[in-house]
Swiss-Prot record:
The keyword Nucleus applies. This is Meiotically up-regulated gene 103 protein. Has a role in meiosis. It is found in: Nucleus, Nucleolus. Keywords: Meiosis, Nucleus. One of its GO terms (biological process) is meiotic cell cycle. GO terms for cellular component: nucleolus.
């Protein structure tokens, strides 16, 4: 395994930055790994010595990036243009951040209006 680590470190950069290679998903014994290099040069090759896990290697391509203006001819949104395609709405990236920002905005707006009301009623 130590010898493989040295090989992996020396071969990682050219494969990672190669534009012709796409990100791929690999399942080994129930564990999902995402890698960009082809299997013999990726970190999956470390498990190839184990003959039992070799037959469980399945290659799946990730869903393609879809532009928002090509899907249902919607109005183009710059924030959604490069978002990866997801089947479940719960798995969409940044959904939690967006909801948190909205909640934070509503809370801060309520506080501002409350303070403004208090200041207005104190004067009269």
């Amino acid at each position: 395994m130590e010898q493989f680590e040295i090989i992996r470190e020396s071969d990682a950069d050219p494969y990672y930055f190669n534009k012709n290679l796409r990100l791929e998903e690999c399942e080994i014994d129930g564990f999902t790994s995402i890698y960009k290099a082809p299997p013999p040069y990726s970190f999956v090759a470390g498990l190839s010595k184990n003959t039992s896990s070799n037959s469980f290697v399945i290659h799946k391509c990730l869903p393609p990036l879809q532009r928002n203006n090509t899907i249902r001819k919607r109005k183009r949104n710059p924030f959604l243009a490069d978002r990866p395609y997801c089947i479940n709405s719960e798995d969409m990236p940044l959904s939690d951040d967006r909801d948190m920002l909205k909640e934070r905005h509503v809370k801060s707006r309520k506080l501002l209006l409350k303070e403004k009301g208090n200041r207005f009623y104190r004067r009269s």
